UniProtKB/Swiss-Prot annotation:
UniProt name for this protein: tRNA 2-selenouridine synthase
Record organism: Pseudomonas putida (strain ATCC 700007 / DSM 6899 / JCM 31910 / BCRC 17059 / LMG 24140 / F1)
SUPFAM superfamilies for this protein: Rhodanese/Cell cycle control phosphatase
HAMAP family the record matches: tRNA_sel_U_synth
Enzyme kind, highest EC tier: transferase
Record text on subunit structure and interactions: Monomer.
GO molecular function: transferase activity, transferring alkyl or aryl (other than methyl) groups; tRNA 2-selenouridine synthase activity
GO biological process, one term: tRNA wobble uridine modification
Taxonomic superkingdom: Bacteria
Sections of the chain in a coiled coil: none
Keyword Iron applies: no
Stored InterPro entries: Rhodanese-like_dom (IPR001763), Rhodanese-like_dom_sf (IPR036873), SelU (IPR017582)
């Protein structure tokens, strides 16, 4: 039999298959990419056992657990665990602390299905701690540089051409702006942190010691950048991306209208997709009402509404340029100009997409890798 595992680094580097014995409510709060939730107890059973433990102690709680997970319920779950184990002979199982739940499942698999299947010692909690420490160590030991620029300059496009990027918006499934929500939901905060840490781990294992980040706020949609990383972002050097106003408008039109509306159709269907896209865009505009002021918000909202109606009627997106131009001129550009002035001392290079990309590639080569 393979031994139980304590090599968390290799588990994540190799994307080792794992099944999670925790209840669905625990899994939903935070898990690891690619892991399958095959719980020993469902949420209701876990709650009953927890109440019993508080009132009558461990022995009574264990007895109740065995009573709740018995007969056909136990058999169905055992079959699911056995199927996973057979499909993934190199995998592992775990529970919250690597204790009773995973040991019970291990025992049932061994005694009733004839399968010897190892567990992760320390369970979810130990692996989660390892990933938190991974991010912390990278902040302490690695070199970081930020890419900033006005809205629509294509910062994400440039980042995706680099092999040493940490894509905060990608991990958060959000574009980072008031209009940044995607057609699919954002991950739970813990999932966001875990995905980011695994990304760091894999890149450092490839010898990367310098990371490029987009210059973000602390909050990316509903996801919060880890505090130690965000604190570092307040003083990391900055590379400023520049592009013409016309190009920026066209890029925003592509990303936030053409591509996003197509994404809504793909996710929600031809009928509901356009309606939900329009609702999302109008809500995004409503979210910045206070920052725009009443008159400006009303004017830009009306332009957006007319553009959405024309898009739904004919498929044409030309009218969207009007509110995009207005929002850039009257809101985003003045805000970014103020932010750039505040960060001027940290800007070490400025240029267009090609120049910035080449600068960052050259910069990565001349910096020591850790």
């Amino acid at each position: 039999m393979r031994p139980d595992c304590t090599d968390f680094r290799q588990l994540f580097l190799d994307d080792v298959p794992m099944m999670d014995m925790r209840a669905p409510v625990e899994f939903a709060k935070g898990a690891f990419p690619g892991v399958v939730n095959l719980p020993l107890m469902n949420d209701q059973e876990r709650q009953k056992v927890g109440t019993c433990y508080k009132q009558q102690g461990q022995a009574a709680a264990i007895a109740l657990g065995h009573q709740l997970v018995s007969g056909t319920t136990k058999q169905a779950r055992l079959e699911a665990w056995a199927a996973f184990a057979k499909a993934h002979p190199d995998g592992y199982l775990y529970c919250f602390r690597g204790g009773l739940r995973s040991q019970i499942v291990q025992g049932w698999l061994r005694d009733e299905a004839g399968i010897q299947y190892p567990r992760v010692k320390g369970g979810y909690k130990a692996m989660r701690t390892f990933l938190l420490e991974t991010t912390q160590q990278a902040v302490e030991q690695c070199d970081f540089v930020l890419v900033g620029g006005l809205t629509g300059t294509g910062k994400t496009d440039v980042l995706h051409q680099l092999d040493n990027v940490l894509d905060l918006e990608g991990h958060a499934n959000h574009r980072g702006s008031s209009f940044g929500k995607r057609a699919t939901a954002q991950p739970a905060q813990i999932d966001f942190e875990n995905q980011l840490a695994i990304d760091v781990l894999k890149k450092r294992a490839r010898g990367i010691g310098q990371f490029v980040l987009e210059d973000e706020g602390r909050i990316v949609g509903s996801c919060t950048v880890p505090l130690e990383l965000y604190q570092g972002m307040q003083h990391y050097p900055l590379v400023w991306l520049e592009d013409s106003f016309t190009n920026r408008v066209e890029r925003i039109l592509r990303d936030y209208v053409v591509n996003l509306s197509a994404e809504f159709k793909a996710v929600h269907g031809e009928e509901d997709g356009p309606r939900l896209f329009a609702e999302r865009m109008l809500q995004s505009m409503a979210n910045i009402y206070k920052r725009l002021g009443g008159e400006r918000h009303q004017r830009l909202s009306e332009m957006l509404r007319e553009a959405l109606q024309e898009q739904q009627r004919s498929g044409a997106v030309d009218l969207h340029r009007g509110w995009i131009e207005g929002l850039l001129n009257e809101y985003y550009d003045p805000m970014y100009a103020y932010q750039r002035a505040a960060k001027a001392e940290r800007i070490e290079f400025a240029g267009d997409a090609v120049e910035v990309r080449e600068y960052l590639k050259a910069r990565a080569l001349r910096e020591p890798r850790k």
